[in-house]
């Protein structure tokens, strides 16, 4: 589980991230990117949110499974130090769609890694 300091929780924070309108999509998962951190806040943690809409699947078990897979994938990539490019942003939101529901853990981890790699490439 992600530590509290890394979690995006307030709806106002989610709305602020969506308002920036920068997104990347890979295999049914969309990454919404908030604005870049100001130089004085470079040491603060990047907040991350994981969303799967009720429109994606009516069963909460399926939705929560996808959120758990995305969350754990991000946590492991964070632990391995493979997401330095993402640390320059205030917030990130991963949104799962129907296409991603049937993916296993390794496929989900690969998708999250690709999204973060795209983010790093496009913001250098």
Where are these regions (language model features)?
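Positively charged, solvent-exposed patches that mediate nucleic-acid binding
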Residues: 1-124
């Amino acid at each position: 589980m992600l530590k509290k300091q890394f979690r995006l929780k307030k709806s106002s924070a989610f709305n602020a991230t969506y308002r920036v309108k920068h997104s990347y999509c890979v295999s049914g998962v969309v990454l919404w990117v908030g604005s870049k951190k100001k130089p004085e806040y470079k040491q603060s943690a990047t907040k991350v949110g994981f969303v799967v809409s009720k429109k994606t699947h009516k069963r909460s078990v399926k939705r929560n499974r996808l959120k758990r897979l995305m969350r754990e994938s991000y946590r492991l990539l964070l632990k391995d130090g493979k997401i330095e490019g993402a640390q320059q942003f205030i917030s990130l939101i991963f949104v799962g769609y129907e296409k991603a529901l049937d993916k296993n853990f390794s496929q989900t981890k690969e998708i999250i890694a690709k999204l973060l790699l795209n983010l790093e490439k496009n913001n250098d």
